[in-house]
Regions:
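Conserved N-terminal alpha-helix of the aminotransferase class I/II PLP-enzyme fold
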Residues: 1-46, 71-78
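Conserved PLP-enzyme active-site core in the AAT-like
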Residues: 38-164
């Protein structure tokens, strides 16, 4: 009741900005996955598009895996160029091709930990090294796998609705 009376921490004037439920779910997901923070959105594409549009602007470049979810591919191929952002699609398992695709205006290296639908496994540790070397942001759609493997079985029922 404190939230509805305006006594809770945070601004919850409109639920589209935030809500106590989203705040607490994000905190629980972050704790569960061993990460600093987690944001909750209504859809995976909502998460992906907002992250990429936050990190990139007109004239920037993204290096992306060529085997990604179709909605993400369509967003990168057809929509984001309207903002002056270009994408190179590469075989993310070939680290030399990844390196060769990086340009001076590249800002993001994008992949899925396990690609949809081909189930190719990205070498996240090596991609992180490349991203650090070139001062890029590594963005990973982790739908099929947890951030940390802390147990043999991890079930996340909100999988399609969370971006951590």
């Amino acid at each position: 009741f404190d939230t509805f009376e305006g006594n809770a921490d945070g601004c919850y004037l409109y639920s589209r900005h935030s809500s106590p439920s989203n705040l607490y779910l994000g905190q629980a997901l972050a704790a569960m996955e061993g990460t600093e923070a987690a944001n909750v959105s209504a859809s995976g594409m909502g998460s992906i598009s907002s992250v990429l549009l936050q990190l990139c602007g007109q004239g920037d470049h993204i290096v992306s895996s060529r085997t990604i979810y179709g909605g993400t591919y369509a967003f990168l191929k057809n929509f984001i160029p309207k903002f002056g952002i270009n994408t190179s699609f590469v075989d993310i398992t070939d680290l030399e091709k990844v390196r060769a695709s990086i340009k001076p205006n590249t800002k993001v290296l994008y992949c899925e930990s396990v690609s949809n639908p081909l189930l190719e496994v990205a070498d996240i540790k090596e991609l992180a090294k490349i991203a650090k070397e070139y001062k890029l942001k590594l963005v990973v759609d982790n739908t099929f796998s947890p951030l940390q493997i802390i147990s043999l079985i991890t079930i996340r029922l909100t999988n399609q609705n969370c971006c951590t």
